[in-house]
Structures are given as structure tokens and as C-alpha cells.
Regions:
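Short, basic/aromatic beta-hairpin or loop at an interaction surface
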Residues: 51-73, 141-161
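Short coil-to-beta transition motif at edge beta-strands of beta-rich domains
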Residues: 39, 78-90, 166-184
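Active-site-proximal polar cores
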Residues: 1-48, 115-131
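Short beta-strand-centered aromatic/proline hotspots
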Residues: 55-57, 87, 93-103, 177, ...
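Surface-exposed beta-loop interaction hotspot
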Residues: 93-165
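Long terminal accessory segments
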Residues: 3-7, 14, 191-261
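Oligomerization/assembly interface segments of phage tail-like spikes and tubes
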Residues: 68-78, 151-165, 192, 206-217
Length: 261
């Protein structure tokens, strides 16, 4: 009936869809993100040392019965607030946006992996020691790129690391070493076997994946600070061989494009 027009669903094909979408976005922000269902999220962008930007967001799948899924979350934010490769601090825990951040005209959606460790290493940009929250997976079942004979004789395991892509992490290369272990007295050393900077490149943002294989602990490794000795690696490649002048990656402090078409 004509008198019940106000009960009708919004018409997104009637020429007033922009107004309707703005109203729905307002409802998402003002009604949902202000409730107890929303969480406070600090966005650090693609550097853990950035000044964080605080937002409210929905974090989904917080109660999972599957081991493979318990370190994964989905996040819904206002449009343009997160990008792939952003580091997020939620309830005192670090998370990494590992997916292309898609968005309809109401909200942005991304997939998060839990950063289950912190890695110290010598930056190939500044040659200072830096610390990154990282996602680490046991990757023994995957191909590391090492020759099978070498792997069988000298290596016992391998790991897959996820880093936010920035002008520091894209400089990783084969044979660069890490110390990474909860055993601080006799830690395990790891050597890079493969680096993937392209597979998760979204509009210049994204993820750097590093496959590392177990290596020997050196007497010159800084066990106290958990920093591997890469002096010979740096000497071999040289400080002036391109490791200080790389193609710029957009410095992300969180956020990205907003398609309003």
C-alpha cells in the first residue's frame, strides 16, 4: 500500500543508491562499531615502529575449534582503514593483514594471521638491529629450494616467515641468517633459502614470504640479543651493491584506496 512506503527496503537501482550506501555506512559506523561487539585496534602500517592509528573494528572467528584456524581472523573496518601488510595490535597481540583487502561500499574486509613470534635481525637498509612481529609456520613439508642431498645431510627443518612488505624487508636474500628460538642458551640458526616479494603484492603493499632452513650456530652470533652474525654476508654483497637504493614501497600507516564509483 502507498501508505506503507516507509517500510520498503532501500532501492539501490532507483537512482538514489549513493545516498542509500552512505546511510548504510553510517549505520555500520555509528551502530555496530560503537557496540561491545567491536574491538579497539591499533594500526601500525607496514613498520612496527610507526605511530599507531586507533580505530574500532569487528574481529570475527574468535572462537575456533580447528587448530589450523585458531591463528586466523577476519576483520571488518570502515572503508580504507587497512591494507595488506599492515601490522595490527589487538588486545596486546600482534596480527598481520595477509590478504588483499577487499571492500564493498559499506566496509573493508581483510584476513589476519597471528604474529606468533618476534624476530631480531640486522636491517639491510640501515644495518642497525630491528625487531619485527612475524608469522612463522613450520614448513618442513614444503620445497625449500635447497638441493635434496644438501637438505638430507645438513638440514633438519625449515620455516616459512611472513613479513610486512617495506623497503627494509624486500632486501632479504638467499643465505641471509636469523637466530630464532625460545631456547636462548642454545638457539637455532636459520638461513634464507627463498624469498617471495611478488606473490602478495597488492598496489605496492603486501607481504614478503621467506623460506628459511636450519643452519649452524656460529661463535660470532649474538646469542644474548638473538641477532645472527651476517657480517660475511654483508661483506660479500657489499653495502653499496644496491642494498641502500631500492625501489620505494609506499610507507603505509594503515589505510588505502577507497573506490566510490
Amino acid at each position: 500500500m502507498a501508505t506503507e512506503w516507509y517500510l520498503m527496503e532501500p532501492d539501490v537501482l532507483g537512482g538514489f543508491e549513493n545516498t542509500e550506501f552512505r546511510n548504510w555506512r553510517g549505520a555500520f559506523k555509528n551502530s555496530i562499531l560503537t557496540t561491545d561487539f567491536a574491538r579497539t585496534v591499533d594500526i601500525y602500517g607496514n613498520y612496527p615502529t610507526n605511530k599507531p592509528k586507533r580505530i574500532r573494528a569487528l574481529v570475527l572467528d574468535q572462537v575456533e575449534n580447528s587448530y589450523n584456524k585458531m591463528k586466523e581472523r577476519q576483520i571488518l573496518t570502515e572503508l580504507g582503514q587497512i591494507q595488506c601488510g599492515d601490522l595490527l595490535l589487538i588486545d596486546g597481540r600482534w596480527w598481520l593483514v595477509i590478504s588483499l583487502v577487499d571492500q564493498n561500499r559499506l566496509y573493508s574486509k581483510g584476513i589476519l594471521y597471528y604474529c606468533n613470534s618476534v624476530l631480531n635481525f640486522t636491517s639491510l637498509k640501515t644495518f642497525n638491529t630491528v625487531s619485527y612481529p612475524v608469522v612463522v609456520h613450520n614448513a618442513t613439508q614444503y620445497n625449500s629450494g635447497e638441493r635434496a642431498t644438501d637438505y638430507m645431510v645438513t638440514l633438519s627443518s625449515q620455516r616459512l616467515y611472513y613479513f610486512p612488505a617495506n623497503d627494509e624487508t624486500i632486501l632479504f636474500d638467499n643465505d641471509y641468517r636469523f637466530l630464532h628460538d625460545r631456547n636462548k642458551l642454545h638457539p637455532s640458526a636459520w638461513k634464507i633459502a627463498q624469498v617471495d616479494t611478488e606473490n602478495d603484492d597488492w598496489d605496492g603493499y603486501g607481504i614478503v614470504r621467506v623460506m628459511a632452513v636450519e643452519d649452524e650456530l656460529l661463535m660470532t652470533d649474538d646469542v644474548e640479543n638473538m641477532v645472527a652474525d651476517n657480517s660475511k654476508w654483508i661483506e660479500k654483497h657489499g653495502k653499496n651493491s644496491g642494498y641502500q637504493s631500492v625501489e620505494d614501497i609506499p610507507p603505509s600507516d594503515g589505510g588505502g584506496w577507497i573506490d566510490m564509483t
